[in-house]
């Protein structure tokens, strides 16, 4: 499987256990990847970035790095102001140090940390759910400013 070969090009310790299709994404092809060592297991998300939607995938990854690093700094500065735990995906670098891998077909792939407790919804589940989504979106907008 191509995803398994690509997954092994990222800087992750251990041996590849699986790289299985996951999610119902409309844009990128997404895989849940598991690597295992004798003492630990690392799960992450591998995505083939859709070049029809994102014609410059390298810019997408540069923007993702800049934004996540900025937001992480802001969260560290403001840690004393919140009782919430905020998690952002972490970019897992390729073995060559880049934020992505380009395969033999010119397709771009990225690896990002898995936020195990995260869920994706097709529609709002309740008024409380909508309120929480709005709160989090507002906080994210504030943090990137």
Predicted regions and their residues:
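A short, low-complexity linker immediately N-terminal to eukaryotic Hanks-type protein kinase catalytic domains
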Residues: 2-15
């Amino acid at each position: 499987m191509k995803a398994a070969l690509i997954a092994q090009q990222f800087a992750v310790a251990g041996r590849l256990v699986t790289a299985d299709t996951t999610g119902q994404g409309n844009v990128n092809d997404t895989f849940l990847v598991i690597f295992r060592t004798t003492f630990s297991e690392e799960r992450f998300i591998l995505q083939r970035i859709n070049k029809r939607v994102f014609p410059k995938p390298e810019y997408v990854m540069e923007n993702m790095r800049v934004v996540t690093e900025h937001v992480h700094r802001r969260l560290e500065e403001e840690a004393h102001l919140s009782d919430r735990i905020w998690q952002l995906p972490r970019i897992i670098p390729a073995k060559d140090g880049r934020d992505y891998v380009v395969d033999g077909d010119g397709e771009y792939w990225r690896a990002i940390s898995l936020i195990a407790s995260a869920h994706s919804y097709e529609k709002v589940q309740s008024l409380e759910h909508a309120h929480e989504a709005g709160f989090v979106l507002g906080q994210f907008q504030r943090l990137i400013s």
